[in-house]
């Protein structure tokens, strides 16, 4: 019965519409989510839903999703929405799977972006000078401005996240700027000082001239940039006789680093040769007679760049010859500063893909340069070559006095523009006859993700945590027990979702350098240690537990501002103030802050009592800690948290790490305001509701990059509409259900038992998908079940029974019982995804049960409904039904019938089918007024014009018009209409229904 029945009043004179048991519900067809959702949020808050969840789950194993802190700066964007919705789906589904699933939201509050905002809004825009951070009062005042700014945006974002339907401990979030957090961050740093891995060193770091700070890898983006390129001759001064008067040629895209050159790297795996220029233009930098050492595979391209007309190879140059050779610096003689020897070092990083086959090595300006220099430092010192790395560029991007002849020349200016250093160096090379060629190269170059300006590698005093130094525990260092070794081991015992995340972070940890944790800024947790210079460039760190305790207690009471107060050094050092200890002024990298959140959230029972007593599986317990962020956090929060926890606790802070992709527009492009292709979550919520965003998140494969835009959201809305209509129909139908009339499973008709079997299959699929964080499967499976199996099949078939059968009908009661069981399961399964819609429906479905669907568990006892034999039988029945439906469509298209109730199909079945489906009510299943079956035996054949489907060619159908009179109540055309004297215009079934309706007081309720 595909349409809602109306009585044929014109034919019979009787209006039976009020006697039908039609759906009745206050659950509206139009969702009105933008208006309804805030009401539900208010209800959740008033009932303290998060508190009730914790109370109901007391004693269960914990599943803690530890929130990766967003930055407290600006309104949330679609990436935030994706991330927070995913987290909420995790926590809600894990709670409903039977865990105590806590969620404490948090914020990252320190760092340069907020400093920039304060400087811009409170100083630059008003023409005021930037505060002098060496002045105690000034830096504390500035830090208070930063704190207020972060607090403002924390509160804005909190409301925006709540509007997404995210349930958490919003009244007690964590923030890295909270006093207790700052105190614990300082304590975590002190642990690295105590275990011997914290050190101050000289090392090239990525430096933002514009921002005046070192940058972590996660803070760098690669953009197109045009660099000056030079091919430079380094004269061989000692070595094999065959290379006398020759020059080693290097190629670089950073001429300004040449004053910092201390070596040349080559590869013993590359073939090199000695080449002679035999013809070149008179005014050329490459002269006739020049002897040049080059990689054989690159010689042709070098000579072409150098405008050499002709050249010849004189001889091969072996690795032993190169290793024994030493060069002079190409700037030798300039300001008396380049008279040192330049050795040749064998390095694995050298290739002959481009350049000359030799790498100009400036250990203060490149990571690989630094690594090969330090690897050879002891041997170089033995040869009388100083291994000291110069500081050739200062924080302003200007060359220093350690770059003689170029002091004050700028690599990059304060605006991030290219300075005059490159040209000055190039002209000096030309003047000394050391330049072979020059050019320009457009390539990918590192830029700060904040300022969008190019960065440089420069040698600076920074604070580091060693990756490969044996960690001291109780005064003893165990050989091989390094931070890198611990981290790699921890990665191997962590669950990564998707699994590819393991290889990604494993590769990053395997190859990463020591962790630079210092920044030269004002808004952050200070590197709260005291030091003394040791005279060799290194420092001694004060190890005094009493001093450390004073610092931590002060931070707990006053925040980290206490470090900058007047007299702070004397206050913390106490009776050690006269020993010459200096207070470090650098602050910690914000990645160290966020990497320490496990310490001041998951382990702080005083401030977060709901998280007290976590005992993870790694400790023999049953609790689980998950981290969930975008895939970029393999080098960000996952990475820093892993290093921090492994360095202080010997293990990862998490058991499961789940990553999602980035959000793109409908064409797969990165979103940007300039392109006008952004999707504002606030606008989507205002127009369609947060549940639409939630459905979009869960319907996509979050492991990959997701797309969103108007057309995609339109499809999501359509999917939602279908799901909502199914829910609405069930709620309306169950208006007539009384649970004390529930029918036992064994007494149900086959169709109901089939649907409960399918529900049991859904239960297994949905539970497994939720357990595996596979929300795309949850949505796809439920949508298919609700749209295809329920709405288009079961509900359609059972509408006649539900609307028209007498209240005493077993079939009707069984159908209502089945729909009740289905509705209960579906609302619970949808709750983590459609949190508002499911809870609104639940309040109407079970007003006498739990006050929120989120306080329930997923159904556990559906497995008892499995009946694989019945399902197999109905696979055949439904195949036959498809043939009948196809035949009806042909008749409808030809306008020979209107409704399927006007038809009486003749179904021709092979004899082999009858053993399985002999007892089927085909009229009921096919929603026709009547149906006949004819068994084809032996050589019997159906009429030639019978309808068939290729996939079931043994079945044929001929559609005839139904014979009889149209029932004024059910619309069925039956010969039995008129057989009941009291109700002559309806069928006997409908007559009985009318009598029972009348006995009930004339109400279909």
Swiss-Prot record:
**Repeat: present as a keyword of the record?**
no
Any Gene Ontology biological process: isoleucyl-tRNA aminoacylation
Q: Which positions does UniProt annotate for ATP binding?
A: 673
Query: InterPro entries from the xrefs?
Result: aa-tRNA-synth_I_CS, aa-tRNA-synth_Ia, Anticodon_Ile_BEm, Ile-tRNA-ligase, Ile-tRNA-ligase_type1, Ile-tRNA_ligase, M/V/L/I-tRNA-synth_anticd-bd, Rossmann-like_a/b/a_fold
- Please list the reactions this protein catalyses: tRNA(Ile) + L-isoleucine + ATP = L-isoleucyl-tRNA(Ile) + AMP + diphosphate
Chief location: cytoplasm
The EC number on file is 6.1.1.5
Which is an annotated GO molecular function term of this record? Answer: tRNA binding
Annotated residues for binding of L-isoleucyl-5'-AMP: 629
Answer whether the UniProt record assigns the keyword Endoplasmic reticulum to this protein. Answer: no
Which key words tag this protein in UniProt?
A: Aminoacyl-tRNA synthetase, ATP-binding, Cytoplasm, Ligase, Nucleotide-binding, Protein biosynthesis
Q: Where in the cell is it found?
A: Cytoplasm
The top EC class is: ligase
Matching Gene3D superfamilies? 1.10.730.20, HUPs (3.40.50.620), Valyl/Leucyl/Isoleucyl-tRNA synthetase, editing domain (3.90.740.10)
Q: Which domain of life is it from?
A: Bacteria
The family annotation for this protein states: Belongs to the class-I aminoacyl-tRNA synthetase family. IleS type 1 subfamily.
Q: What's the stated role of this polypeptide?
A: Catalyzes the attachment of isoleucine to tRNA(Ile). As IleRS can inadvertently accommodate and process structurally similar amino acids such as valine, to avoid such errors it has two additional distinct tRNA(Ile)-dependent editing activities. One activity is designated as 'pretransfer' editing and involves the hydrolysis of activated Val-AMP. The other activity is designated 'posttransfer' editing and involves deacylation of mischarged Val-tRNA(Ile).
- What is its quaternary makeup? Monomer.
- Domains (record comment): IleRS has two distinct active sites: one for aminoacylation and one for editing. The misactivated valine is translocated from the active site to the editing site, which sterically excludes the correctly activated isoleucine. The single editing site contains two valyl binding pockets, one specific for each substrate (Val-AMP or Val-tRNA(Ile)).
Which protein is depicted? Isoleucine--tRNA ligase
Instruction: State the organism of origin.
Output: Rhodopseudomonas palustris (strain ATCC BAA-98 / CGA009)
């Amino acid at each position: 019965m595909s349409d809602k029945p109306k009585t044929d009043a014109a034919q019979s004179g009787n209006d039976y519409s009020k006697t039908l048991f039609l759906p009745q519900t206050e659950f509206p067809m139009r969702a009105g989510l933008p208006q309804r959702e805030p009401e539900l949020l208010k209800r959740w808050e008033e009932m303290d839903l998060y508190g009730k969840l914790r109370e109901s789950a007391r004693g269960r194993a914990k599943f803690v999703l530890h929130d990766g802190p967003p930055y407290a700066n600006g309104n949330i964007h679609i990436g935030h929405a994706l991330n927070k919705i995913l987290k909420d789906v995790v926590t809600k589904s894990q709670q409903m799977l039977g865990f105590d699933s806590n969620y404490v939201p948090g914020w990252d509050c320190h760092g340069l972006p907020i400093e920039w905002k304060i400087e811009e809004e409170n100083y630059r825009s008003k023409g005021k000078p930037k505060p002098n951070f060496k002045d105690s009062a000034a830096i504390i005042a500035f830090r208070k401005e930063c704190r207020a700014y972060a607090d403002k945006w924390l509160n804005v974002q909190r409301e925006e996240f709540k509007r997404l339907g995210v349930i958490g401990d919003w009244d007690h979030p964590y923030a890295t700027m909270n006093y207790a957090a700052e105190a614990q961050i300082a304590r975590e740093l002190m642990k690295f000082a105590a275990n011997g891995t914290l050190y101050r060193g000289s090392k090239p770091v990525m430096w933002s001239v514009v921002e005046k700070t070192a940058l972590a890898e996660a803070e760098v983006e690669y953009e197109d940039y045009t660099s000056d390129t030079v091919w430079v001759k380094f004269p061989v001064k000692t070595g094999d006789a065959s290379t006398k008067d020759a020059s080693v040629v290097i190629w670089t895209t950073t001429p300004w680093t040449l004053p910092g050159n201390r070596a040349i790297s080559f590869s013993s795996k590359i073939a090199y040769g000695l080449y002679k220029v035999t013809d070149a233009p008179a005014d050329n930098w490459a002269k006739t007679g020049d002897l040049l050492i080059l990689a054989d595979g690159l010689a042709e391209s070098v000579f072409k760049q150098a405008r050499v007309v002709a050249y010849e190879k004189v001889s091969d140059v072996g690795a032993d010859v190169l290793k024994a050779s030493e060069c002079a610096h190409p700037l030798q003689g300039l300001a008396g500063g380049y008279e040192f020897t330049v050795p040749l070092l064998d390095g694995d990083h050298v290739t002959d893909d481009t350049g000359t086959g030799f790498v100009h090595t400036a250990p203060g300006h490149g990571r690989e340069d630094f690594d090969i220099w330090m690897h050879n430092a002891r041997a170089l010192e033995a040869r009388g070559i100083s291994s000291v790395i110069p500081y050739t560029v200062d924080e302003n991007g200007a060359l220093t006095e350690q770059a003689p002849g170029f002091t004050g020349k700028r690599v990059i200016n304060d605006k991030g523009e290219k300075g005059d250093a490159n040209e000055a160096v190039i002209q000096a090379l030309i003047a000394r006859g050391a330049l072979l060629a020059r050019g320009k190269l457009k390539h990918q170059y590192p830029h700060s993700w904040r300022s969008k300006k190019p960065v440089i590698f420069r040698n600076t005093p920074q604070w580091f945590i060693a990756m490969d130094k044996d960690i001291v525990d109780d005064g003893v260092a165990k050989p091989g027990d390094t931070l890198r070794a611990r981290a790699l081991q921890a990665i191997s015992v962590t669950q990564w979702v998707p699994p590819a995340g393991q290889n990604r972070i494993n590769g990053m940890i395997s190859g990463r350098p020591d962790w630079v944790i210092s920044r030269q800024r004002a808004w952050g947790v200070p590197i709260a240690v005291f030091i003394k210079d040791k005279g060799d460039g290194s420092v001694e760190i004060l190890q005094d537990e009493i001093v450390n305790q004073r610092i931590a207690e002060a931070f707990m009471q006053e925040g980290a501002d206490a470090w900058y107060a007047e007299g702070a050094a004397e206050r913390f050092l106490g009776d050690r103030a006269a020993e010459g200890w200096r207070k470090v002024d650098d602050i910690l990298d914000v990645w160290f802050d966020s990497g320490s959140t496990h310490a001041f959230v998951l382990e702080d029972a005083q401030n977060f009592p709901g998280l007290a007593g976590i005992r993870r599986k790694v400790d023999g317990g049953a609790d689980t800690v998950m981290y969930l962020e975008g895939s970029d956090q393999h080098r960000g929060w996952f990475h820093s948290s892993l290093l921090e926890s492994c360095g202080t606790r010997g293990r990862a802070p998490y058991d499961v790490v789940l990553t999602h992709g980035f959000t793109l527009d409908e064409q797969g492009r990165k979103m940007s305001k300039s392109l006008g292709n952004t999707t504002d979550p606030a606008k989507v919520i205002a127009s369609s509701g947060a549940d639409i965003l939630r459905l979009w998140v869960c319907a996509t494969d979050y492991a990959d990059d997701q797309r969103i835009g108007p057309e995609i959201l339109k499809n999501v809305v359509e999917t939602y509409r279908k799901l909502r209509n199914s829910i609405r129909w069930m709620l309306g139908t169950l208006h007539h259900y009384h649970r004390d009339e529930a029918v036992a499973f064994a007494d149900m008709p086959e169709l109901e038992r089939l649907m409960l079997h399918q529900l049991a299959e859904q239960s297994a699929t949905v539970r497994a998908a939720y357990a595996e964080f596979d929300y795309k499967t949850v949505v796809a499976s439920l949508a298919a079940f609700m749209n295809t199996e329920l709405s288009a099949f079961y509900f359609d078939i059972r509408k006649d029974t539900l609307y028209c059968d007498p209240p005493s009908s077993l079939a009707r009661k069984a159908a209502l019982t089945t729909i009740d069981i289905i509705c209960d399961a579906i609302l619970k399964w949808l709750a983590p995804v459609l949190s508002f819609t499911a809870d609104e429906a639940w309040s109407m479905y079970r007003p006498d049960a739990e006050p929120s669907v989120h306080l329930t568990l997923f159904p556990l006892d559906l497995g008892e409904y499995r009946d694989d034999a019945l399902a197999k039988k109905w696979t055949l029945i439904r195949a036959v039904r498809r043939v009948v439906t196809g035949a009806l469509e042909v008749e409808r298209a030809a306008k020979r019938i209107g409704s399927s109730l006007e038809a009486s199909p003749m179904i021709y079945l092979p004899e082999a089918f009858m053993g399985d489906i002999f007892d089927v009510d085909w009229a009921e299943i096919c929603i026709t007024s009547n149906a006949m079956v004819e068994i084809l035996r032996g050589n019997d054949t159906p009429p030639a014009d019978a309808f068939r489907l290729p996939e079931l060619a043994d079945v044929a159908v001929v559609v005839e018009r139904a014979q009889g009179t149209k029932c004024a109540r059910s619309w069925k055309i039956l010969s039995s209409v008129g057989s009941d004297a009291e109700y002559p215009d309806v069928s006997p079934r409908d007559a009985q229904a009318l009598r029972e309706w009348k006995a009930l007081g004339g109400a279909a309720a």
